[in-house]
Amino acid sequence: MGVADLIKKFESISKEEGDATVDTNSSSKPLKSNDETKELHQQESTAVPQEVDVNEEFENEPETINSSRTAEKPLETNLPKPETNEEDEEEGSMSENKIYSKGENADINVNDFQEYKEMENTGAEVLASSVEESDAIQEGVAEETEGIATPKQKENEKNDESEEESANNASEPAEEYSQSEEDADIEQSNGKETENAENASQQANDGSTSTTTSKNKKKKNKKKNKKKRNGNVNTNANVDDSTKTGENDDTTGDTTSSTTSAIQEVNDLEVVDDSCLGIDQQHNREHLKALTQDVKEETLENIAHEGRGDNTGDQNAVEKSDFEKSDTEGSRIGRDLPFEFGKRNLTEESDVWDHNAWDNVEWGEEQVQQAEEKIKEQFKHPVPEFDKKLYNENPARYWDIFYKNNKENFFKDRKWLQIEFPILYASTRKDAEPVTIFEIGCGAGNTFFPILKDNENENLRIIAADFAPRAVELVKNSEQFNPKYGHATVWDLANPDGNLPDGVEPHSVDIAVMIFVFSALAPNQWDQAMDNLHKILKPGGKIIFRDYGAYDLTQVRFKKNRILEENFYVRGDGTRVYFFSEEKLREIFTKKYFLENKIGTDRRLLVNRKRQLKMYRCWVQAVFDVPQ
């Protein structure tokens, strides 16, 4: 039996039974008793399946049915929409309204209601069959749409996985409803499912095509942007390299990069001139060439000032001049008295921004007063006693961790040693006598390897020692290490047992090199260090010393909880540092064993011309003799 036939049957039954229905307003019959109402509800619950929405209304309502309630839920919302013409639909809707009521308030007879329920059960079966038909139709639509979208998906699968997902999403049918939602919406969905299927398949094809085109455009744009970014990264990398070079080398790096950039500007200008027909830019070329020459001259001044060749910039851009060679080979090396830390002296305050470093800068009272005030503030927040004990118990451990993290890359090779200490230069000459050099606190070999590299003395023996085992390993494992002349061992200068380093006999060392090592010892270790140092030095030997000076920029910059005691600090990595004055250094070394040869303070003003900053650095340098 079809749905249309069922509706017609409902209409005929309603006409036949219309006279039997009594209007409560006109006849004023009393309502059914409670027992009859209960029996009616029991019959309803047993006879009507719960899947049909109409049953729920009759189970929860009394016999008297309000026409307004029935109007809110007409039967046509619960029945599937048949594929019939418009006239059948209108007739069906009219008959359904008649089933519910014949007037404003209809009193339904129990027998009539049971007959109606039996017919409606038949309608529920039809509804179930129509639901199954709609599910089958939906599955067929899904298969059709999937079949349409599959070729596009295969094309787009090679390009991008996201396209495949979008095509699949476009071709898939709508999500399944729950049973109650399906019963409520089945009529509307059946009427439009064919149209939706066609639209879905069309959208799948259009979506896959549009996504393919948009994805291809995006990929092309990404490639273009990536090329641009790579070009910018390369440019920035070159700038960063020149910047880092300038930071690591106070004088040479900045001017060398400036020279390179100035030369590049000249080259760029020449390229532009070729395209500027008839335009004379000779004046600009001459100006840039003059600027380049000035930068070259400044670079050569910096090289002479530092006393070393430039190995950080463009070697083709800056070549050594006769002035540089004569300065380093003639006037400076071999000169022992007095110390000469540099030649660039600041005579006029207005010239301070002309260079990035000035030598022999005397501190005024204002600078000293500012440094003392900052140090007083540091004393208000010293290192706690518990932490102080940890830092002082095993200082070698913190230096070992330091070299584990930084390896040999932290400090630069000290190529200025043979200029500031000509005795080292004399010891490495080919015609020099047999000599033993002992570097204490060798670290990663930044002093050891420059001496070994320049050595021409077949009778030279150089020993490197450090109390950090990892530092000694770095020296031994370096490609520059030459066991023919060099030896490396672990040794603590302030060891309380007075043990000598491995491979060193008592009073066998001619020159002891102490470059930035003595500052790592605590003041209560100085006396023991002097005893051990005296044991290894020959009579007539020398001690070469350089370390941090009092009021140095690094001392003034220390923050809270860093000061251990006067002029003695702990860094953030746990390593300790002391800042010496000439008076304190003289007191330590000449107290018992050694004689003062010379002591000097290297004061230098570093200038950040871009940020207009002045930074005062201070180092103490000395040579001590061992009595005969």
Swiss-Prot record:
Any one GO CC term of the record: actin filament bundle
Record carries keyword Zinc: no
EC id: 2.1.1.268
Assigned keywords, A-Z: Actin-binding, Cytoplasm, Cytoskeleton, Methyltransferase, Phosphoprotein, S-adenosyl-L-methionine, Transferase, tRNA processing
PTM-bearing positions, type Phosphothreonine: 150, 347
Compartments where located: Cytoplasm; Cytoplasm, Cytoskeleton
Comp. bias regions, Basic residues: 215-230
Classification via SUPFAM superfamilies: S-adenosyl-L-methionine-dependent methyltransferases
CDD domains: AdoMet_MTases
Cleavable signal peptide: none
GO MF annotations, alphabetized: actin filament binding; protein-macromolecule adaptor activity; tRNA (cytidine-3-)-methyltransferase activity
GO biological process terms on file: tRNA methylation; viral translational frameshifting
Main localisation: cytoplasm
Subunit structure, as described in the record: Interacts with SES1.
Function recorded in the entry: S-adenosyl-L-methionine-dependent methyltransferase that mediates N(3)-methylcytidine modification of residue 32 of the tRNA anticodon loop of tRNA(Thr) and tRNA(Ser). N(3)-methylcytidine methylation of tRNA(Thr) requires the N6-threonylcarbamoylation of tRNA (t6A37) by the EKC/KEOPS complex as prerequisite. N(3)-methylcytidine methylation of tRNA(Ser) requires the formation of N(6)-dimethylallyladenosine(37) (i6A37) by MOD5 as prerequisite. Methylation of tRNA(Ser) is also stimulated by SES1. Binds F-actin and shows weak F-actin cross-linking activity.
Note: N- and C-terminal domains are encoded in separate ORFs that are translated into one protein via a +1 frameshift. ABP140 mRNA translation follows a cotranslational transport: mRNA is transported to the distal pole of the mother cell, independently of the SHE machinery, and follows a translational coupling, in which ABP140 mRNA is tethered to actin cables via its nascent protein product and is transported to the distal pole by actin retrograde flow.
Family as reported in the entry's similarity comment: Belongs to the methyltransferase superfamily. METL family.
Name of the protein in its database record: tRNA(Thr) (cytosine(32)-N(3))-methyltransferase
Species per Swiss-Prot/TrEMBL record: Saccharomyces cerevisiae (strain ATCC 204508 / S288c) (Baker's yeast)
